[in-house]
Amino acid sequence: MNVYDDVIDPTVVSHSVCGHFTTTDYLELIVIRTDVLSIYKPIRSGRLYLMEEHKLSGRINDVALIPKHSNGSNGNGINLSYLLLSTGVAKLSLLMYNNMTSSIETISLHFYEDKFESATMLDLARNSQLRIEPNGNYAMLFNNDVLAILPFYTGINEDEDEDYINNDKSKINDNSKKSLFKRKKGKTQNNKVTHPSIIINCSELGPQIKNIKDIQFLCGFTKSTIGVLYQPQLAWCGNSQLVPLPTNYAIISLDMKFSIDATTFDKAIISEISQLPSDWHTIAPTLSGSLILGVNEIAFLDNTGVLQSILTLNSYSDKVLPKVRVIDKSSHEVFFNTGSKFALIPSNENERSVENILLFDENGCIFNVDLKSEGRLLTQFNITKLPLGEDVLSQKSNPSSVSIIWADGRLDTYTIFIGFQSGDATMLKLNHLHSAIEVEEPTFMKDYVNKQASAAYNNEDDDDDDDDFNLYSDEENDQVNNKNDRTFGTNESNEPFTAQELMELRNIGPINSMCVGKVSSIEDNVKGLPNPNKQEISIVCTSGYGDGSHLNAILASVQPRVEKALKFISITKIWNLHIKGKDKFLITTDSTQSQSNIYEIDNNFSQHKQGRLRRDATTIHIATIGDNKRIVQVTTNHLYLYDLTFRRFSTIKFDYEVVHVSVMDPYVLITLSRGDIKVFELENRNKKKFVKVPLPEILTEMVITSGLILKSNMCNEFLSGIGKSTIEQLLFTFVTADNQIIFFTKDHNDRIFQLNGIDQLQDSLYISTYQLPDEIIPDPSIKQIMINKLGNNSKDEYLTILTFGGEIYQYKKSRSRHSRFYRNVGRNDHPITGAPDNAYPKGVSGIERIMHYIPNFDGYSVIFVTGNTPYIIMKEDDSLPRIFPFGNIPIVSMSRWGEGSVICIDDIKNARIYSLNQDNIYYGNKLPIRKIKIGSMLQNYKTLNSIVYHERTQLYLVSYTKEISYEAKAEDGSLLIGYKPELPNAKAFKSGVLLINPKSWEVIDELDLPDNSLVNDMKSSFIQIDTRTKRKREYIIVGIGYATMEDVPPTGEFHIYDITEVVPEPGKPNTNFKLKEIFKEDIRGIVSVVNGISGRFLISQSQKIMVRDVQQDNSVIPVAFLDVPVFVTSLKTFGNLIVIGDAMQGIQFVGFDAEPYRMITLGSSITKFEVISVEFLVNNGDIYFLVTDRDSIMHVLKYAPDQPNTLSGQRLVHCSSFNLHSLNNCTMLLPKNDEFPRDQRYSRSFQTITAQVDGSISKIVPVKEETYRRLYFIQQQIIDKEPQLAGLNPRMERQDNKYYHLGHSLRPMLDFNIIKRFKDMSMNRRSHIVQKLGKNSNLEVWRDLIDLEFSLRSLKPTDQN
C-alpha cells in the first residue's frame, strides 16, 4: 500500500514542434518533457514565455501539428492546427484548443496496439514511430513491420467513392426533415476530422519488405508517397562478410480510397534499390529527394529512386559502396548514430534548387549538408561543420529534438530550438549561415555521368527514359578527394558566420546518483543571526555527462540572501516608508502592548521622537499617499493624516475596530469588524484631509470580510465608453461573508459586479453584474484575495485566493476575454498549504497568514505569505507560478525594502533584510534547483557519477569518469596485432574521486586512478574499528573495476578512505581536509557495489558478495560470503538485512548474522527482473522491496513468511507493478515526516526517493490501510468521473504491463498526481465525493493529503508548522 508522487517534474526535452495551436497571433513552440506539454511564445529578442502547460497521465512518444482544413483563420490567412500526440505502445490522440474555456479538448482517440499484435508475429517495440505527410493529410504510426495510416478529412474530393458521396447527401436530406438538434448533428458529421484508419503489414507493400529501419513520407509527389528503408535479411557486423550490402530502399506511392466504414489503398512501387550498406538507418526527406543517414556515410537519392552520390564521413566508411560518385569527407571523423536529429531549412522562393539540411551529432556539433540541383541533376553535395565557437553548445550533448522557429533567407539568419538529453535546451540563432558553408566548384559533378547506374539500380524492363538517370562517373567507384577543389567563401553575405545562444530551458537530466546533505544550511549563523535555512537538508545529485556534467541541489525551500540583520525588543508588524526616492522611516508596532515606534533608517535606526505619530496604539497600516507627500496611519479606531515630518493634519474616528486596510493613492479602503467598509479619497488641492467616497447602496445589505483597491481591465467590457479597451481601471474590490468577490468603480452609479463561481471555487470564473441573492448565509472561507501580475520579464495577471484554512488557490486571467479567469485543473499542481473545515489547524495557528504583494523582488513580481511556514509565490518566464516555502523560520510580518529587497520579522523579534538568491538557482520546477559546476576550463572532470555526503565533516565526495582513447593491449602490455593508432579509436575510461567543500564548492583533494578504471560505487558508512568498545568511525568505501578487452579478464579493487583535518593552504581556509587511505585490496573480478552493514562493509566481487571487517590495525579480513547468480547491479542494507538486485535474476533478500558470521538467504523473487535499482520499503514493521527494471517498471515485493504459498518467505510476494514514464537510475531511503504523529507503538516511518534519466525525481510513500482505502476511492472517482487530457486512462498508463497478473489487482500503487486533483475540484464536487466515504471523511481525507504532501519535510527538521 504505497503512493507515488513527483518531487521534480521531468526536465529533458524529448520532442518539440512549431506552429499555431492556441492562437494565430504569433508562432508557438510546443515542447514535450516526457508527460508534460508546454506551449511557449518565442520572442525575437531570444526569450521563451510560457503560455500554457498541461500534464498528461502517460508518456508522450511524439508530437505533430495537423493543419485544420477550414475557413477558421483570424484574418491573417493562418489557420489553427490540431495537435496529434503519440502515446503508449501504439496510440494517437487528436487534440484541439478551446479558446472559450482556455482548455484542450480531445477530438478523437485511436488505439492500434491490439491490431498491431494480431497483424505481426514479432514482439512490438515499446514505442511506435510517428510520421506526418508533408501536406498534413495523413499520419502514419509504425512499429516494427506493421503500420497504421490515419487519413485526415480535407473535404469531399471528386475521386472519392460515389457511394460515399451519395450516402452523405442522403444523410443531409434526411436530417433536414428532423429536429434542430439532429440537423446540427448531421452538420457535425460532415465536418468530421478523420477517416477510418487502415492497418498495413509491411509485406503488403512489397514481398521482400520486412525488418523496417525507417519509413518517411516523401516530398514532391502529387499523391502520398513513402520511402521505406529495410533489410530483407537481418544483418550485423558479424555476418558482414556474407552479406556486405544488406539494406534496400523502396519508393512506394499510396492511393488511398475512403468509405464510411473503412479505408483501402492501392500501391505502386516507383523504384527499389538494393545492396546498400547495413549502417544506413534514417531517411531525411528533402524537396528534391531524400538523404539517407548512416553511421559512416550520407547518401542522396532523387525522387525517381536513383542513388546519385555518397559522402563518406569518417575513416570507417564502408569500403564496399555502391557504384556511384563517392565524395571523401572522412576528415570530419563524425558518426551519425541511429536517432541522430536533422532539420530541413526552408528554401528561398527564388532558389528552390538549393537546399540545406542541418545534422546534429551526439557531441552537440552541427553540420550543414547543402544540395544544389539542376532539374534532376545534383550539382552540389557537400557537408560542412559549423564553427559554433568554444562556448556555444559546449556543455550539451545528445540532441533529442530540433525545431526551426524562424528562417529568414533574406538576412540568412535562422533561429532553432534544440533539446538535449544532457544539457539545457537551447534557442540558438545562426547568423549568416552561408558564410560558413564550404562552396564547391559549381560544375564539379556535371562531368561525371555514371552510365551503369540505371542498369545496377533499376529493373531490366524499365523504359528507355531511365537512361536519363545515369548521372555519374564511368568508374565503378570513383573516390574523389575534393579537399583541393573546395573554397571557403560566402554565398550570399559578406558577414562572418556567428552562433548565439539566446535562451536556455533548465535540464538536470539524466540523474546519475544522489544523496542528501547540507547545502543552504552549511553556515549556522548569517549576519549574526541564525541561518534562515537552519538545519535544512537538500537532495544533491550528479547530472549529465561529458562537459555538461554538474551537480544539482534540490533545495527544501527558497534560500534568500541576508543583506542585513536587526534585533527588536517589541514588534509584531513592520512597515518601511519610502520617501523622496529612498527608505526614510521604519515603523513598527506591537499589538500585545498597543504601541508603535518610528526609526530613522539613515541614522543607524535610531528612534525618531519628533512629530505626532500615534505611538500609544496598535498600527494596522501606514503608508505614503498624495504623490509621496503625505503619510496615512490607520490604528485600531482612527485614521490619521500627516505630512512628511509627521505633523498631523486630520483625524477620523471609527466606532468599530479596523480589521483590514488597503491604500492606493489617493484612496484608502478600510474594513471594520462590523462587516462594513469605508472608502476615503485624499483631497486633491491641499492634500490636508480625506473626503468620503459614496458607496453603492446595495453594500449596506452585505457583510464584508476584507477589501482591496486594484487596477485591472477585467470589467472594461461592462463599463460604458471603454468597451474593448485594455486600459486598466481602478476598482474597489471586496470579499463578502458568503464568499463572493464584488467590484465597483468610483463612478459606479450604484452598479457593482461580481465574480461568478468563486464561492464554490469553480474551474472557470466570469464577471457579471451583481444581483443580491434571496438569502445570504454567512460562512466565510475566503480570507484574502489579490489580483496582480506575477513574473519576471513576462508578467501575467492572476487571481490569488487565501482561505482561513491556509489554502492557496490561483486563477489566470483569460487571454481572449479579460472578464474571465480559469484554473488549469490538469496542471495546477501547487503544493497543499492548508485545509478547510479546520482539518489542519497547526498551519494557521500562532502566526496569522497574510499575503503581501511585492512588485519588485530582485526583478520578480511575487507574493509572500507570512506564517509558521512562510511561502513565496513566484513565476519564471518559462514556467507556471510556483509556491515554495521561504526559509525554515517563521515570518510574522514583512515590508518592501530598497530596490528589490524585503524586510521580514521572525517569531523571536529578529529582522532580516532579504534579497533573492539567483546564483544559478532555477525557480521554475516544484522545488528550487541550484546548479553547481565542478571544475573549470583548465580542469574538466567530465562525467560526474557517484556522490556521497560525509556527515562528520559536512563534505561531499564525487567520483568522475573521463573518456580516453582506447589502446588495444594484451595482458603483457603490448599492442595487439592489427591495432591502428592513426584511426579514431574506441573510448576507454579513466576515473577518480573528488573531495568537495560545499562552502565554496571547490575541489580540495583529488584521487586519480589509472587508465581503464571505473568507479562503480562509493558509499559513506560508519565502520566499527574497535571490537571491545564498539567504537565506530565514518569511512568512505570505493569500489573500482578495470576492463581492457574481451580476452583479458576484468579485475577490480576496493579502497577505504578517511577524511582527516589538516592545516589549510595559505589564503584558502576551506582546504582544511584531505583524503587518507586506510586500506586497499586488489580483487579478481570487478567490484560493482559496496555498502555498509552492522558496523562492517560488504562488496560485490565477480559473482560473490563478501562481508569484511576492519581491525584495529586498519587491516581488513573477510568474515562471510554469498554466491549470486549473474551480476549485482544494486545492493541496499537496512540494519542487518540486505536486498540484492541481479542484472538478470531478480532480487534476493538476505540476512547477516555476526555471531557466528554468516549470510542467510531469506527469500528471492520468482520473476526474473533485469534489476537496475532496488531499495527497502518499510511500512509499519512489514518489509517491502522497491525494484526498478530495464523496462521502466517499478515493482513492489513483500517478505511475508506467514502467508501461504510463500514457503515460509522464501518466495517474495509480488504486490504491484507500476509503469514509470522514464528509466530509473537510482533510489534512496529517507525518513518520512509524520505531520500527524501516530502512537509511539508504531515504528519510525520511511519513504523512498527515485531519480530518472529524464531529470525527474519522485517519492514512494507507504501508507496505512485506512488511508489507502480513502485515497484509492478518490483516485477511482477522479479516473472514472473526471475528463482526462488526451483521453489517456491513468489506470491503464500506470498498470498495463506484463506483470499485471502477478500483483494484487485491488492493491495497486496509487498515483498522487491524480489524487491531488481532488484539492482543485469545486467545493460541491469535493463534497459529493467525500460523502460517499462516510461521516467525518472530509477531515480524514484532507489530513491524508497533507501528510503525503509534507512527507519530505523531514528535510526541514526544525519546521514548526
UniProtKB/Swiss-Prot annotation:
<dbReference type="GO" id="GO:0006369">
    <property type="term" value="P:termination of RNA polymerase II transcription"/>
</dbReference>
<dbReference type="Pfam" id="PF23726">
    <property type="entry name" value="Beta-prop_RSE1_2nd"/>
</dbReference>
<dbReference type="Pfam" id="PF03178">
    <property type="entry name" value="CPSF_A"/>
</dbReference>
<dbReference type="GO" id="GO:0006397">
    <property type="term" value="P:mRNA processing"/>
</dbReference>
<keyword id="KW-0539">Nucleus</keyword>
<dbReference type="InterPro" id="IPR050358">
    <property type="entry name" value="RSE1/DDB1/CFT1/CPSF1"/>
</dbReference>
<feature type="compositionally biased region" description="Acidic residues">
    <location>
        <begin position="459"/>
        <end position="478"/>
    </location>
</feature>
<dbReference type="InterPro" id="IPR015943">
    <property type="entry name" value="WD40/YVTN_repeat-like_dom_sf"/>
</dbReference>
<feature type="compositionally biased region" description="Polar residues">
    <location>
        <begin position="479"/>
        <end position="493"/>
    </location>
</feature>
<keyword id="KW-0694">RNA-binding</keyword>
<feature type="region of interest" description="Disordered">
    <location>
        <begin position="455"/>
        <end position="493"/>
    </location>
</feature>
<dbReference type="InterPro" id="IPR018846">
    <property type="entry name" value="Beta-prop_RSE1/DDB1/CPSF1_1st"/>
</dbReference>
<comment type="function">
    <text>RNA-binding component of the cleavage and polyadenylation factor (CPF) complex, which plays a key role in polyadenylation-dependent pre-mRNA 3'-end formation and cooperates with cleavage factors including the CFIA complex and NAB4/CFIB. Involved in poly(A) site recognition. May be involved in coupling transcription termination and mRNA 3'-end formation.</text>
</comment>
<dbReference type="GO" id="GO:0003723">
    <property type="term" value="F:RNA binding"/>
</dbReference>
<dbReference type="Pfam" id="PF10433">
    <property type="entry name" value="Beta-prop_RSE1_1st"/>
</dbReference>
<comment type="similarity">
    <text>Belongs to the CFT1 family.</text>
</comment>
<keyword id="KW-0507">mRNA processing</keyword>
<dbReference type="GO" id="GO:0005847">
    <property type="term" value="C:mRNA cleavage and polyadenylation specificity factor complex"/>
</dbReference>
<dbReference type="InterPro" id="IPR004871">
    <property type="entry name" value="Cleavage/polyA-sp_fac_asu_C"/>
</dbReference>
<protein>
    <recommendedName>
        <fullName>Protein CFT1</fullName>
    </recommendedName>
</protein>
